[in-house]
Structures are given as C-alpha cells and as structure tokens.
Swiss-Prot record:
GO terms for cellular component: cytoplasm; nucleus; proteasome core complex, alpha-subunit complex. This is Proteasome subunit alpha type-5. Keywords: Cytoplasm, Nucleus, Proteasome. Pfam families: Proteasome, Proteasome_A_N. Belongs to the peptidase T1A family. It comes from the Eukaryota. The 26S proteasome consists of a 20S proteasome core and two 19S regulatory subunits. The 20S proteasome core is composed of 28 subunits that are arranged in four stacked rings, resulting in a barrel-shaped structure. The two end rings are each formed by seven alpha subunits, and the two central rings are each formed by seven beta subunits. The catalytic chamber with the active sites is on the inside of the barrel. Its main location: cytoplasm. The keyword Cytoplasm applies. It is found in: Cytoplasm; Nucleus. CDD domains: proteasome_alpha_type_5 (cd03753). GO terms for biological process: proteasome-mediated ubiquitin-dependent protein catabolic process. The proteasome is a multicatalytic proteinase complex which is characterized by its ability to cleave peptides with Arg, Phe, Tyr, Leu, and Glu adjacent to the leaving group at neutral or slightly basic pH. The proteasome has an ATP-dependent proteolytic activity.
Amino acid sequence: MFMTKNENDHGVNTFSSEGRLFQVEYATEAMKLGSTVIGIQTKEGVVLAVEKRISSPLMLGSSIEKIIEIDDHIGAAVSGLTADARTLIDNARLEAQNHRFMYDEPINVEVVAQAISDLSLRFGEGSRKKKVMSRPFGVALLIAGVDETGPRLFQTDPSGMFIEFYAKATGAGTEAAQSILHEKYNKSMTLREAEILALSTLKQVMEEKLNSKNVEVALVTVEKKKFEIMDTAFIENLIGEIKEELI
C-alpha cells in the first residue's frame, strides 16, 4: 500500500511512489534561497566570496559569519540555514583534529568533504536522544583548501553528494552566477584574477550594492597553506580594482 503524498512529505526516510524524497527536495530549495556563494580554484590557491544579507540598519554586519575555518588549511562558505551548517562544520573540525592527532599530519580536503556528506545522510537515524537531525540539513557548503595534491574546491548539498569544481556558485543567484563563471573562468587565471572574478560575479547577482560590509572573502594559497578570512581593507581594495576595470 502506497503512502499518500502528505505522508511522503513528512516521512524523511520514505521514498514516494515516484522514487522521490520530498524532505531532501525541500532542503535543497532552502539551500537555493540562501546567500550567493562563489568559489574559484586556481593553481595558486582558492578564493571564496559570499554575500552577507544585512536585513536591517540596526544589524551589525560583522556578526554575520558566512565563511568559517575548519582547519588551518581548510574552510567553508555557507549557503542556506547557518544553524545547520554549524553542526556539519563542528563535525568536520572534529574529524580534522582527530586526523591530526592520530597521524600527525593535516587532513586531506576530500576527506573533510566526504565526512560532511556522510553526516548529511544521517538525518532521522538512531534513537531520539542520539539523532543528529530529525530532517535533512538545509545547507550547501563550498569547501576550499590546499593539501598535498594542491588547491581543492568541493561542494556538498543536502542529498549527501560532494563534487569537486574548478569554479562553482551556489545559493540564490546560482544560475546567473554560474553562467558568468562558465563564460569567464579559465584554468590559467591567477589568484588575483579569480578574486576579481568572484567579487564582480557577486556584484552582478546581488540585489544590494556591493561594499566591504555586505560581502565576505577568504583565501587559501599553495604558498602559505593557510585559510585566511580577509579584512575590509582587502575587500575595499578589490572593489576598487573592479571599478577600474569597468571604466
């Protein structure tokens, strides 16, 4: 006997008669409503840029965290429900710390992406007290890092998939941003060119005027092997270069 559509809507572990998990689809839609996130990989490193939505003049923009460090050499940008992202990132940090403790070496970026994706699939699992989440995680992460293989950029999503990209956009402006990246990205571009492309892409898809307070930028380079969230002075300088290009 098949469940009704309404029952399928609420059943997190039950496929519909069409082979769909509606709760995962709803979580994916929540992800698409999140802040626009851009990630670009180059030979020199990876850049992440994300829109920070400041909904009120009384809101302190610096309190909004959309880019979070996972380990010294890895970080992630968040699109979707930030509270859900904290659970995933806290787990990823624990994986990175355990790996460093056991093997005395930094964790591989792909291993972190897989650990996050594995946790994404554990909704509705176990007893009520031990359950990680009673529903799918409504968040996508762009994970940037540098390991022994070089710069890496992965996306994870609510379905538990993780895929590596050269350049990727996610969130509310995905279609327009991805189209721009597809047109302008090339594998030989420098990290600085990638920084400018990331911010100029955000500029074209954001509803608000781009400034140093409503975007966040992070870099991880092959040279330093350190994930760094950049300050407002860096962002203002980058915005200035974008304006010069448009003149």
